[in-house]
Amino acid sequence: AAVLDDSDLHAEVAVPTHVAAQVDDAARERIRRAPYLMCEYLHAMGTGPAGAPGYAAQMSHPRHAGGFVWEWRDHALWRTLPDGRRALSYGGDFGEEVHDGNFVCDGLVDALSRPYAGTWAWVAAMAPDAPALARAIVEADSGSVGERDRLRALAETDLVPCADEADSPYALDESGRVARIGDMPVRIDLSVFRAPTDNDRGRGPVDYWGIDASNLGPLGVGRGEAGTSHAMRWEHARLHLLRRRLVSIEEGGGVRRVVERWAPPAAQFGVTLTWEYAPVRIGEEGPNALSVSLRVAPYGTWPPRVPRLGLRLELPGSAWHATWLGDTMIGYADMSVPGARGCGSGDACDLWDVCVRPQEGGHRQGLEALSLRGEAGEFLILPASPLGWSVSRWSERELAQASHWEDLPDLERLFLWLDVFQDGIGTRSCGPDTRPEVAGRMRDVDVRVVIAQVRGD
């Protein structure tokens, strides 16, 4: 729907508005001939905005006269914490009792003028030849030539069966869970939850929940029902409370097979995981490693979309440095920078998009190889099936429950997610939901990955 702005003496302009706007037939005919502006077609609150390519495709229409993303900058202010540190803050942090929220932190850049990951994705859709974008892509490809070549060689090296049980690259505990890789304690969990983004918490009317890709309307239509956010639906389904039950452990031919079931409490749906663990060597003279094959088989009726399907590894220590092959910039199914692939490098603590309120914001797609270096040596991840990844010192639940980064615990650990998929980001904080084409839908899938600890000298 649209209304006609006739305030200009020379040209009337059609301005799209809420789908429920009342427009008479005569005005509608004039609107169809007028130039049009897309007002607040995307909203830049939190992780995002996403979905820009769909709107960029509309801009070649001869009547199109421009559009606006809301908005340019986060409205956050410095606050001095009791320990003397300063933090960007909002709402009730300054005694505001009525409007305590981070909804004024909705900029393409933060309060210090630093672009968010979603901003680069938006630029890539709207102005792919922008010099600033070209510089950002080059800067993200920060790994050295030597690191690039080494990871490429590792990713392409054949695996050799490892028969030396005295130097096993892994151990399982009595319940069939991975207890260590190399001599490093490691915990692996299934994850189908993420810390809700501001868009996941959005309650606007452009909601695609339950709509599949075969029943799509035009951009910005959806269900037309406001009120319930994806975050509320995921919480109601208790996706953050998955529980594990061991089914069986078998061993034969050098392979250990573990079958387990995961489900939320009191749910009539869940997933059966079948793990196969085998010791291997990366090349004839390379390090010992663990080959992991995982079959994911959902049962029951899952929610129509889930935040993610992935593995969460917990590693000791927090001072890790990452080098990887794959997408070098943060991205999601509906929020990415085409061409930003190569060899990235950076401290693990710097690989998350830090919005004012903690939320999901560190996913990178298309992982080919990952090296994490810390006090315990090097931790290698070599995927043999499509995976995205992210790292954070905090779990999904800890991020979801925190209102500020300074509220999070200071613990010596690192979480590494290896994701089969994540739900799209969308822009539903004040705009359209994630489109069904990029929805996270639980499904049967096989995952294959090689994991190794390379001990330091």
Give residue ranges: language-model regions.
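Extended substrate-binding grooves/exosites of carbohydrate-active enzymes
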Residues: 1-158
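Beta-strand/loop-rich accessory regions of lumenal/periplasmic or secreted enzymes
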Residues: 149-150, 154-457
